[in-house]
């Protein structure tokens, strides 16, 4: 390499003649106490040479920028990034206004008394909770506010004779090495949120000075026959709920004590205070200048896809793209890389002599450069686990030293485990935990928000941004890197562009704003929104609502009965409908049922417990007959449902926000308002699911089953009401004449969870469009109580109804809407999609084909053999004949013949191994090529190999192109015939095999059926 490398002989360097060596004043000091074994690419000594060179040295981490050399770390507490983030700020003495983006719970013990103000020393004896509020001040300085005196507590109902104090003391003494804590007990009277109950119970409130022992104490009490409540509530939730605070937003501190000694964070400013000194400022919605870092790593992988535990598979480059929230300036672009690198336009390049030095720079950037949010693409599954593995297994970095805080620091990635007992592995996500940093993996976000054939960054960028990656195969990276500064610049440019695309995606979706609004509404830390599911969101809100009514929440025992009858449908009547089909939807169906019927834990009376409430008359409750027997819910005049109250408040707030949004002109405020209303919508819809998960935080399957039961009944009642409306009655209900044919009628042809498909036979489109909303409103007012509401959602001009959740039709605006058909399935290849689409277009838009479809739809399956195909239907056969010729002539591109299937679990966990995508995975593995990640979609093409099982015909499309392999013509054509049959089977009594046989019967081609 052409700059001075302090770890190897520079005379055996890279391709340039000039060797940049530091002047004597630049020469590094060598701390004798730090000895590191650095791994250096062997190509730095001998151009093109593979492998690494191990050098044992005491040099401090070093970087180069142009002719300048510097040290990554400056002194004991600094780094290059600390000096670049600006001047140190002076701490205010009496008044502090600051914004919080994250809250971290830590525990101080008595040996820390000298580190904290005298007034808080007794709060940490023997231990005490300290909440670290991380954020920015008004002038943009990073700040950590250490909040003392926040207690955690739970409740217990102890049987007669249990000495509570003795049990707690015994449990604390056997604390298994955990920090001891102070505790106190207090008798209180509370209602229990489990079922309808007018009684208040004498329970003990157990308050702890810190939380590490809470689980131990709770378990011990349970063992002694006590029932415990709310022992699953942490100190952060108590802090937010008990004092009306928030996990994200502006705070005012009236008595901040600056901490200048014994600093416990890496922020610019640090203060100590009590929770009593804080005041939340809800009216302020603007963001401070938070920094978002988008990063990407490139690795060597000389023997195949990189393996972090192999010395030679080192990280060679890390791109860092930074954006300041509220700043429209171009991104700050940096490239950290090994060896020399040619300049890149608009990119600040840092050159490092070894991987160790580069990792030191990147990790210290996370800590010292005021980065609050990090993003990337698949960083939870690849980039961060790879960095962690290199830093801790190859080197000896203490990653806890590179977060925002010191006490209680965490820097790790929790990855789901597979296995036959893996539970919800397929739905689980890797969780990034870095204290004081909010991770946003845009791979996970895009999988949630988009429906694509695959979720590679290139595919997503094309779809969302209209741009492509500067793609380089991982196989090309090692030779480019070894080739010298020019090759490393090409890899670096590719690396930087990836980070730019990810930042663009984040800003397009405004994911950081969305998760902050959900965090505020759900009262959970922002970093938990994307990975911790919806249960914790509803739980926090229910906890708050329960507290205001004097309720305490039980802790589930884990023995809940799972399973209940979920949402069912009105069976579809398959066929082709050339009359208008009106689709009506229940607005917010499940939330509205909870509100309308006053459903809640607090209003529930199990079927065998009604006799315990003799004061109730039949008018005081509503009865529902579930699969396990009847249950009852008291009506609102006896007790209002807590869940319904929550929903009512949320929905009223959403309505108000949307009204404000309509007249808002400030773009930043508009984004925040839009994400607020979206957060409310998502959380409202999660309430039903919260009750219906048997393994959830507070399951109540009686509520969930009642909701779905009412949903079914509402569909059935709506069907009966609408189908009974004659043209004359419709005119009477509308109070005006309606243009219809004499035999006009309504027929419900399908009902799906919250919607009805009504075929308006004998009505024209204009008439249906005219009365659609009124018909929905009349049905609502006649059948249902508020706030249940039926709305006209859409009208089909014609509809091909296949089976449940599978239909395709032309809407009133002439657009085609498809659901569940092969055309839009991720597993279908483009050739099959395009040809099927051509057939579908004929059926939906070509008059002669429409007429043929309508005629066939009313006949027996064997009718076409007796009468022949109607004239219009021959056009479909012609499309299939032409498609076969294209396949035989090899005129179909390989890309159009590519299928994709998701790798849903580790390979070893598949019971059936002879699946096409698994075959390709195994072939890639055998060739030591890049392996897909869990949840990636694996592409494959079927090639011509007579006598093999179908799964063995699968091959990666790039391999097919490189080797010019022939595709399996008959197999692809058979897939096309079956895809077309799936679309038109509703014309033939929904008999797929009969439809396939009919198509083959009328085709004009020689066919060899593929091996099954």
UniProtKB/Swiss-Prot annotation:
GO BP terms in the entry: bidirectional double-stranded viral DNA replication; DNA-templated DNA replication
GO molecular function terms attached to this record: DNA binding; DNA-directed DNA polymerase activity; nucleotide binding; RNA-DNA hybrid ribonuclease activity
InterPro entries per record: DNA-dir_DNA_pol_B, DNA-dir_DNA_pol_B_CS, DNA-dir_DNA_pol_B_exonuc, DNA-dir_DNA_pol_B_multi_dom, DNA/RNA_pol_sf, DNA_pol_B_thumb, DNA_pol_palm_dom_sf, DNA_pol_type-B
Subcellular location(s) per record: Host nucleus
Top-level taxon in the UniProt lineage: Viruses
GO cellular component: host cell nucleus
Listed Low complexity bias regions: 21-31
Catalytic reactions of this protein: DNA(n) + a 2'-deoxyribonucleoside 5'-triphosphate = DNA(n+1) + diphosphate; Endonucleolytic cleavage to 5'-phosphomonoester
EC number(s) reported in the record: 2.7.7.7, 3.1.26.4
Region annotation (Disordered) ranges: 1-31
Family annotation (Pfam families): DNA_pol_B, DNA_pol_B_exo1
SUPFAM superfamilies: DNA/RNA polymerases, Ribonuclease H-like
Disulfide bonds: none
Similarity comment: family membership: Belongs to the DNA polymerase type-B family.
Quaternary organization: Forms a complex with the ssDNA-binding protein, the DNA polymerase processivity factor, and the alkaline exonuclease. Interacts with the putative helicase-primase complex subunit; this interaction may coordinate leading and lagging strand DNA synthesis at the replication fork.
Purpose: Replicates viral genomic DNA. The replication complex is composed of six viral proteins: the DNA polymerase, processivity factor, primase, primase-associated factor, helicase, and ssDNA-binding protein. Additionally, the polymerase contains an intrinsic ribonuclease H (RNase H) activity that specifically degrades RNA/DNA heteroduplexes or duplex DNA substrates in the 5' to 3' direction. Therefore, it can catalyze the excision of the RNA primers that initiate the synthesis of Okazaki fragments at a replication fork during viral DNA replication.
Name used for this protein in its record: DNA polymerase catalytic subunit
Native source organism of the sequence: Human herpesvirus 8 type P (isolate GK18)
Gene: ORF9
């Amino acid at each position: 390499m052409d700059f001075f490398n302090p770890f190897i002989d520079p005379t055996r360097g890279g391709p340039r003649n000039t060797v940049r060596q530091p002047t004597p004043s630049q020469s590094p000091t060598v701390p004798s106490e730090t000895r590191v074994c650095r791994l250096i690419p062997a190509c730095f000594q001998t151009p093109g040479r593979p492998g690494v060179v191990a050098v044992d040295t005491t040099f401090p981490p070093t970087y180069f920028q142009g002719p300048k050399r510097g040290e990554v770390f400056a002194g004991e507490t600094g780094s290059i990034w600390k000096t670049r983030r600006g001047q140190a700020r002076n701490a205010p003495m009496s008044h502090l206004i600051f914004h919080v983006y994250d809250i971290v719970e830590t525990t101080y013990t008595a040996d820390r008394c000298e580190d904290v103000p005298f007034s808080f020393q007794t709060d940490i004896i023997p231990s005490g909770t300290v909440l670290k509020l991380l954020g920015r001040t008004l002038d943009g300085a990073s700040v950590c506010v250490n909040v003392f005196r926040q207690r955690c507590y739970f409740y217990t109902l102890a049987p007669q004779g249990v000495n509570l104090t003795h049990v707690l003391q015994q449990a604390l003494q056997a604390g298994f090495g955990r920090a001891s804590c102070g505790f106190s007990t207090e008798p209180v009277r509370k209602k229990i949120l489990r079922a309808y109950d007018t009684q208040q119970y004498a329970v003990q409130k157990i308050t702890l000075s810190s939380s590490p022992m809470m689980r131990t104490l709770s378990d011990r009490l349970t063992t002694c026959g006590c029932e415990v409540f709310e022992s699953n509530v942490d100190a952060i939730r108590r802090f937010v709920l008990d004092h009306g605070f928030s996990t994200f937003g502006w705070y005012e501190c009236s008595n901040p004590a600056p901490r200048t000694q014994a600093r416990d964070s890496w922020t610019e400013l640090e203060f100590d205070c009590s929770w009593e000194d804080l005041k939340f400022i809800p009216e302020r919605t603007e963001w401070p200048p938070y920094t978002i870092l988008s990063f990407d790593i490139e690795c060597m992988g000389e023997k195949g896809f990189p393996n972090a535990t192999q010395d030679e598979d080192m990280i060679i480059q890390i791109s860092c793209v930074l954006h300041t929230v509220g700043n429209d300036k171009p991104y700050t672009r940096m490239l950290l890389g090994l060896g020399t690198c040619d300049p890149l336009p608009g990119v600040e390049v840092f050159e490092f002599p070894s991987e160790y030095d580069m990792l030191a720079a990147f990790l210290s950037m996370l800590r010292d450069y005021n980065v609050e949010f990090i993003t990337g693409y698949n960083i939870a599954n690849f980039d961060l686990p790879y960095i962690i593995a290199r830093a801790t297994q190859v080197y000896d970095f203490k990653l806890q030293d590179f977060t925002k805080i010191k006490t209680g620091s965490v820097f790790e990635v929790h990855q789901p485990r597979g296995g036959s007992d893996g539970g919800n592995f397929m739905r689980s996500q890797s969780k990034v935990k870095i204290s004081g940093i909010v991770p946003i993996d845009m791979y996970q976000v895009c999988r949630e928000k988009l429906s694509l054939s695959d979720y590679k960054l290139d595919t997503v960028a094309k779809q969302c941004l209209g741009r492509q990656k500067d793609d380089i195969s991982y196989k090309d990276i090692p030779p480019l890197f070894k080739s010298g500064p020019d090759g490393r610049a090409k890899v670096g440019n590719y690396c930087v562009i990836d980070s730019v695309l990810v930042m663009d995606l984040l800003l397009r979706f405004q994911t950081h704003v969305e998760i902050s609004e959900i965090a505020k509404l759900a009262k959970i830390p922002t970093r938990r929104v994307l990975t911790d599911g919806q249960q914790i969101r509803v739980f926090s809100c229910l906890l708050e609502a329960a507290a205001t009514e004097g309720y305490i929440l039980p802790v589930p025992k884990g023995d809940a009965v799972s399973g209940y009858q979920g949402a069912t449908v009105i069976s579809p009547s398959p066929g082709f409908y050339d009359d208008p089909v009106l689709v009506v939807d229940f607005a917010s169906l499940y939330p509205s049922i909870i509100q309308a019927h006053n459903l809640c834990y607090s209003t529930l009376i199990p079927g065998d417990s009604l006799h315990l409430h003799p004061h109730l008359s039949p008018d005081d409750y509503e009865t529902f007959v579930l699969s396990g027997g009847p249950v009852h819910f008291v009506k609102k005049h006896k007790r209002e449902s807590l869940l319904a109250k929550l929903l009512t408040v949320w929905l009223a707030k959403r309505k108000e926000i949307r009204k404000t949004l309509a007249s808002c002109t400030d773009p930043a405020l508009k984004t925040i308002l839009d994400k607020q209303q979206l957060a409310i919508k998502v959380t409202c819809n999660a309430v039903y699911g919260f009750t219906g998960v048997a393994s959830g935080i507070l399951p109540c399957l009686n509520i969930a089953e009642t909701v779905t039961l009412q949903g079914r009944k509402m569909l059935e009642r709506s069907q009966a009401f609408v189908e009974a409306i004659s043209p004359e009655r419709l005119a009477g209900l509308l109070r005006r004449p309606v243009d219809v044919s004499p035999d006009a009628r309504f027929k419900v042809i399908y009902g799906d969870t919250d919607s009805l498909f009504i075929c308006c036979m004998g009505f024209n489109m204009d008439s249906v469009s005219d009365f659609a909303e009124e018909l929905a409103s009349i049905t609502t007012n006649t059948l249902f109580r508020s706030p249940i509401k039926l709305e006209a959602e859409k009208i089909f001009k014609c509809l091909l109804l296949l089976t449940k959740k599978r239909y395709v039709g032309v809407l009133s605006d002439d657009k085609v809407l498809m659901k569940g058909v092969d055309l839009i399935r991720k597993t279908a290849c483009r050739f099959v999609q395009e040809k099927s689409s051509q057939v579908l277009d004929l059926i939906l838009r070509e008059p002669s084909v429409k007429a043929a479809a309508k005629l066939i739809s009313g006949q027996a399956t064997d009718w076409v053999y007796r009468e022949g195909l109607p004239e219009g239907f021959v056009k479909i056969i012609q499309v299939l004949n032409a498609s076969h010729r294209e396949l035989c002539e090899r005129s179909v591109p390989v890309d159009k013949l590519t299928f994709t299937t998701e790798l849903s679990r580790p390979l070893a966990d598949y019971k059936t191994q002879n699946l096409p995508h698994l075959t390709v995975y195994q072939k890639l593995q055998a060739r030591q090529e890049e392996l897909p990640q869990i949840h990636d979609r694996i592409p494959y093409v079927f090639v011509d190999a007579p006598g093999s099982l179908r799964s063995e015909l699968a091959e990666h499309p790039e391999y097919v192109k490189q080797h010019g392999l022939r595709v399996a013509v008959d197999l692809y054509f058979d897939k096309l015939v079956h895809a077309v049959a799936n679309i038109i089977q509703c014309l033939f009594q929904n008999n797929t095999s009969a439809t396939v046989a009919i198509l083959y019967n009328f085709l004009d081609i020689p066919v060899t059926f593929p091996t099954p």
